[in-house]
């Protein structure tokens, strides 16, 4: 039976990733309030995502060197404070500062929370990591809808409620943290005992970790490409409404969240490597079919398995990263949950330039080609031996 503490950590994951998804929906209100242009408004998203992605491996490194599990509690407080003040900041400098503060909280939460989940999981590591990931995916998907409803009801100042949400979840995890730490520490102590009894020392496998990063880079570009251009594709290529396109994007996220849970069970039953290979072997063919048709019915039908397959290998990738670097698990979590994800955000402007120069259809053909990278790399990774 899965530890109840995993669900608590998943709730915290929901809170920190909620802010990333909600910021994009907050931009139109900030533009109207401060008379920003699109470029200036976009720098707010860039600032939050960049700082959270870049410094996440640093927090992972510190987690491996020191006992920093407690940092998940101030991380939630900082995230809530940063996002909750966005509606009240009256200067661009203050808005950027709030986004940076929020980004630091996001970066601080992921590595130690992922390590705790691994320690609490015992034998059901895939299921535990999928529950943890589900919380983050649900937060990312639910953020735009929730913040829009709050802003419509209370105005942009209503986002201050997020400070209370972050504080409430922080208090909940603070209450359970001593028990979580004891249970997780017991797991790692038993693991170290098994390793000390083994004549072969446990070494970090950097070569396979680098190959795994290539898998994640490809997934990140596909995810951000769909996240950025799906609504536009729905409007300009399929000739549907903006509302219809937004609904399609919501369906992608909802199906994806379900895929996260399915992926966790697959990891426990068929292994992480086979789960990754299964998803990325099929992915290029679905994206190619998506790019070749202009039928709304066919594209809508293809969207379901595409959304599922993007998220099915997510937990497997995070777990495999930790297994490849057993002596650097915090760093591994920081890279797989942070730095590697930012690659997709960096690639998105280049895809936008391609769309301007050619068409949105070309962008989806490029995403199809990109899908060949994780497909090929998946067959060069192996399942590490777990002692």
Task: Give the ranges of each region predicted by the language model.
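Helix-loop-helix hairpin linking two adjacent transmembrane segments in secondary transporters
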Residues: 132-179
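Conserved MFS/SLC helix-loop-helix module at the cytosolic interface between two early adjacent transmembrane helices
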Residues: 54-90
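Residue-level signature of mid-helix packing/kink "hotspots" within the transmembrane helices
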Residues: 21, 49-57, 140-141, 253-261, ...
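Helix-to-loop junctions at the C-terminal end of transmembrane segments
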Residues: 55-67, 260-271, 355-356
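Cytoplasmic helix-loop-helix junction between adjacent transmembrane helices
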Residues: 98-135
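C-terminal transmembrane helical hairpin of 12-TM major facilitator-type secondary transporters
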Residues: 267-317
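C-terminal membrane-cytosol helix-exit motif in multi-pass small-molecule transporters
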Residues: 164-191, 375-382
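Extracytoplasmic gate region of multi-pass secondary transporters
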Residues: 23-24, 207-257
